[in-house]
Amino acid sequence: MRTWVPLARLLQPRSRAAELAALERRLRDELAAEVDADEPALARAVGEAKLALATSITDVVACGSCASGHPLPVGQHPGGACCAGVTGELFDDDELAALAHAGTRPADLQPPARRHPHAGCAFRGATGCSLATEHRPARCVRYFCHGLRAEVHRRGQLDDLEARVATLDAAMSAFRTAHRARRDREVVAPILAAITRHLKRGATGS
């Protein structure tokens, strides 16, 4: 069977293309999972809390130069030092599931242009994150380094933003609990089914 690969990915540096392909596979697997109504509802709450926080942080300057002077890969771009992590770790199973069930689809995972070197997260570019806020992990939206905290404190916004961070953290915690409980059930279900079949065979003497 032929696998269709987006042209944009083929034009990416090999390391970024590989991370994008792995992330897309995981996202498709999560989208194919059977979930009850609670998990998508909790995921949407995470998305709403992310947007509420992100729209409250405007015109900050700390994020545009925080990586300057750092060793590679952090210092490859002037800003986004906190974005220099590994894509698969930033989009861990909980974060990716929250995105999937809030509406993120493979087509939403748009990388920066090829001219932006791959330096950390696959979506980190010279001008910032290539993803729309609703498609970013919660940890990316809620992270406040010392420089950013100092900036919003000087602007008198820190207390409000910390309250919004707490709301996002609570929403993500509730989703994480539901998601992990479902994953546990997925692991246990085949075991219980096998035990049930064994007991039935024993009862019938077959």
Residue ranges and their predicted role:
Residues 1-205:
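Hydrophobic scaffolds flanking metal-cofactor catalytic centers in soluble metalloenzymes
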